[in-house]
Amino acid sequence: MSEGPPSDPISCPRSATVMWINWTGVACMIAAACILRQIPAVPDLAATLIVAAAFALPLIGLEAVLLRGRRAPEHPGDAVPGGPGLIGHTVDYSQEGIDWHGPAAPSFSRFAVKLIGLWTTLAIIALIYTIVPEYSATLFDPFWSMLEIAIPAFLLVSPAYFWWADGRMRQPYDGYWHVGALILGWSNDAGLSKIRQHALGWTVKAFFLPLMFAYFHGNIINFRGANFSELDAMGWHYFFYNLLILVDLGCIVVGYALTVRLFDNHIRSTEPTWSGWLPAIICYQPFWGLMGPQYFAYRTDMDWGTLLEAYPALQVVFSVIILGLMGIYTWASVSFGLRFSNLTHRGVITNGPYRFSKHPAYLSKNLSWWFEALPFIAPFVFGFRGMGWSGHWTAAAGNTLRLLAVNLIYYVRARTEERHLSHDPLYVRYALWMERHGIMAWAQRLARFVRYRPPQGRVDARREDVDSGT
């Protein structure tokens, strides 16, 4: 008897990472941080680098042994190159990265052009850091101190790595080569769309890495200095809250710092549009510092801890909910392993909380803000305390609308990320599977504006299969 057609024609593709490997790195990260709490003689900068390395090194080793070649397509449709679209040139995602099986074939001339492209890129970034006053702030002092250690090592290792990678890349004429070709005056050979993608990828790293490293360094200092004997119930809440943020930042810093084909976590493509960049960078300093207090200030001095101070049991409930939501948020970052980065595509993640939602970090973070800020509660608190009901409704309405505006920013971020990642047929298959199996599938059936929008003309047949359930 022959088997009938499968009940679900689209399966969830495998993830670019393996969760147990990622959790191994997290366990080593936390263990290193705990050990360094007991060794105050270790400088804070050294402690920060050790904790980051404790996360990165186990992942690098385990992935090198277990996941080599994981980008080989598991489904015939995954090998179809993404069309030019917004990126500007065709990207064959099945041919990205290193060829581990073919013979090495480096070219000295190609290698030299790539080095010219590398040093040109770094010189431009150094110039930007020098002339932008924001980077002279004391916040970034740990980042500059880190570079004093990292730059000599980079100067030593990068030529050897570029020579090794050039001989093993499936597509050796990368962005570095095209930048070098442009500097050498080979305008007919330099591809402007590839130079643009190269510049955008480095802009992401140059913008986010200093900020995230500074935050990570600060969290390491706070973790090492925490005095457990002085913590009350709320103190323990914020300790675990900050521990979750520390793990999140550790994953983020490693993701931005290590972007190399050797680890298969290189950038496949970068968001090419202003409509994708603006809602992302507005959420970070210095832009949030300029706009947040003026237009999106939904918090007041009366957060959930203050408002519920007279109700300890309810305070515990809110603490558990908030920590649970932030746990999901951190879990989402851990799912990326070595591949975390805003505005870029570095491999499709389908495990961890991404097995249930395309945007678990955004959902959990935005929900946690509602529980933390309680922007609508002030009139009720003042009213039931006998302090009057009038005069508070306008403030509550304003705070609620401002938090809804922040939620809208993250909704736009989610939609533009989907648009960018849909350049990869593998992500299209994942998104269509999630449309049917994700925890938000009910919302997509009820409201078309939240439904996934795949590229037209490439997955219409699959979409019809999903709709019909055949």
Task: Write out the residue ranges for each language-model feature.
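Membrane-anchoring alpha-helices and their flanking helix-loop junctions
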Residues: 2-343, 372-470
